[in-house]
């Protein structure tokens, strides 16, 4: 691995003793506001959002190797985390401009890699929407943008975690059969691209290469992939990068995410952990709004704990150390 000693030490702070990244993701901003808005008539307040993040940090970070937060609402939570829990901070603005073509990336204007590091981050995380089949005039802008962030992180000697979310502007529903058919190529080709040294990415945070809801044996309706085909997509994903890579939970249920990790492992994917968000804590949102802080704490200590504990047990059996990657 051609990483500096400082970067290696930082990634070690984000992973457990086995070299597995069992990270809790709570950098949601727009998605969190939408979740909260389902359960209350008024606009979610800054205080509500900050407190919910603090509750999750206080109750669950003792079971996570690290937590991903945003510097907009997550700094009180970063202070509340367990002392042994590493910190990733998000560098991107939430969402994207729906009126502009291409889902172009945008940094938080008040932040830099230097400032995130000064804030105590062990790594910088940036989310990029990427479609390998988009027009080159769009993709060249994205590639240049990621090069800039990569260079910034090299200058500050801080690990760069790149999160890639795939899409297709011609297929509005990425949960559809139509998108499921093109997803494996889009996910794996994007991984291959951003593994190139010019981007200076240290760890990839990625989607699983299939929509598990259309895999034979998991599907309730139409089947897009046989088990063998799905397994091959996971093998291809593992071969697409020499970098450590971790899976995001993409808002699926805790149970489905755990089953997905088992499937990936059996297929031969040597993934190095997870950044799991909503699959762990989403149920606390409604409880917090409707019943208050104490009830939310109780949910986190019971159901939330079970979600993260079950996930950790699955990771122990399925994930491999990032130190085994080149």
From Swiss-Prot:
Which EC number(s) does the record attach to this protein? 4.1.2.40
SMART domains this protein is in?
DeoC
**Which molecular function term from Gene Ontology is one that the record holds?**
6-deoxy-6-sulfofructose-1-phosphate aldolase activity
What is the reaction catalyzed?
D-tagatofuranose 1,6-bisphosphate = D-glyceraldehyde 3-phosphate + dihydroxyacetone phosphate
| Biological process terms in GO annotation | 6-sulfoquinovose(1-) catabolic process; D-tagatose 6-phosphate catabolic process; lactose catabolic process via tagatose-6-phosphate
NCBIfam families hit by this protein: lacD, PRK04161.1, PRK12399.1, PRK12858.1
Pathway assignment reads:
Carbohydrate metabolism; D-tagatose 6-phosphate degradation; D-glyceraldehyde 3-phosphate and glycerone phosphate from D-tagatose 6-phosphate: step 2/2
Annotated protein name in UniProt = Tagatose 1,6-diphosphate aldolase
Species, as recorded: Staphylococcus aureus (strain MSSA476)
């Amino acid at each position: 691995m051609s990483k500096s000693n400082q970067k290696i030490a930082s990634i070690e702070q984000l992973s457990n003793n086995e070299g597995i990244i069992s990270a809790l993701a709570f950098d949601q901003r727009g998605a969190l506001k939408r979740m909260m808005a389902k359960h209350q008539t008024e606009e979610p307040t800054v205080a509500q959002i900050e407190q919910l993040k603090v509750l999750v940090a206080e109750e669950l970070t003792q079971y996570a190797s690290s937590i991903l937060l945003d510097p907009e609402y997550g700094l009180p939570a970063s202070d509340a985390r367990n002392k042994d829990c590493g910190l990733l901070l998000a560098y991107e603005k939430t969402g994207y401009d729906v009126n502009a073509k291409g889902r172009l990336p945008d940094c938080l204007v008040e932040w830099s890699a230097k400032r995130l590091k000064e804030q105590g981050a062990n790594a910088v995380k940036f989310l990029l929407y990427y479609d390998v089949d988009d027009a080159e005039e769009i993709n060249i802008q994205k590639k240049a943008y990621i090069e800039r962030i990569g260079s910034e992180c090299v200058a500050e000697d801080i690990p760069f975690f790149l999160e890639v979310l795939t899409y297709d502007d011609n297929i509005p529903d990425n949960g559809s059969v139509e998108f499921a058919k093109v997803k494996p190529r889009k996910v794996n080709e994007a991984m291959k691209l951003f593994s190139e040294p010019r981007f200076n990415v240290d760890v990839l945070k990625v989607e699983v290469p299939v929509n598990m809801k259309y895999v034979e044996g998991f599907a309730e309706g139409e089947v897009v992939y046989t088990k063998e085909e799905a397994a091959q997509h996971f093998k291809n994903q593992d071969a697409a990068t020499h970098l450590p890579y971790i899976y995001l939970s993409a808002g699926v249920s805790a149970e489905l995410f755990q089953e997905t990790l088992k499937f990936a492992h059996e297929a031969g994917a040597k993934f190095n952990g997870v950044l799991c968000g909503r699959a762990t804590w989403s149920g606390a949102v409604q409880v917090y709004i409707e019943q208050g802080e104490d009830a939310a704490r109780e949910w986190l200590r019971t159901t939330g704990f079970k979600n993260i504990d079950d996930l950790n047990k699955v990771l122990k059996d399925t994930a491999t150390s990032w130190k085994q990657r080149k």
